[in-house]
Amino acid sequence: MKKLTIIFILLLSTFSCFSQAEFTTCLFDGARNRVIPITVYQPQKVNSKTKVVIINHGYDGNKNRKSNQTYSYLTRFLSQKGFYVISIQHGLPNDPLLAMEGDFMQTRMPNWERGVANIYLTIQEFKKLKPQLDWDKLILIGHSNGGDMTMLFATKYPHLINKAISMDHRRMIIPRTEKPR
């Protein structure tokens, strides 16, 4: 019985080593009168070496109010590896639908610009809330439409991010700059 208790305690302590905080909250952009829902995946240990990753989801027709949690397998994995992960909910129910025809560089630009503004505000607010994080090595990750937003952000604000990763974006041009990589 004593052996079983010791094994149980060891197992519990192992799980606590990998535990992390996960919560959903909202930011508010007063200039645009816009609520920006976000989900945060905080690693167990947070210090000045903790890198930040911002995830930008793909388009879902503004139907799913939790699109930013679609990639929870990735966000949780990154958090377990020690990254502070912020996943932004870009599409809101009242937003115009994404254009499905025409010159996407023109017809989808308002959506991408809205996403860039969401990312920018998120960075600015979290720098105030979590100044102890390593903001010099900020990583943006985006899938599909979120990848387009990521590439546009990297083009407009290369000095704010260290790496831009796109998973299956097809429209936005990848910035040809030394930074971000």
Question: Locations of the language-model features?
Answer:
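Conserved beta-strand scaffold positions in the cores of enzyme catalytic domains, especially
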Residues: 22, 85-87, 164
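Extracellular/periplasmic catalytic domains that process cell-envelope and extracellular macromolecules
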Residues: 32, 47-48, 78-80, 133, ...
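Sec-dependent N-terminal signal peptides
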Residues: 4-13
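Short beta-strand/loop motif that positions the catalytic acidic residue
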Residues: 181
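Serine-hydrolase catalytic machinery in alpha/beta-hydrolase-like enzymes
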Residues: 34-129
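A domain-start/cap signature at the N-terminus of enzymes
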Residues: 17-49, 159
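Primarily recognizes the serine-hydrolase "nucleophile elbow" in alpha/beta-hydrolase
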Residues: 121-178
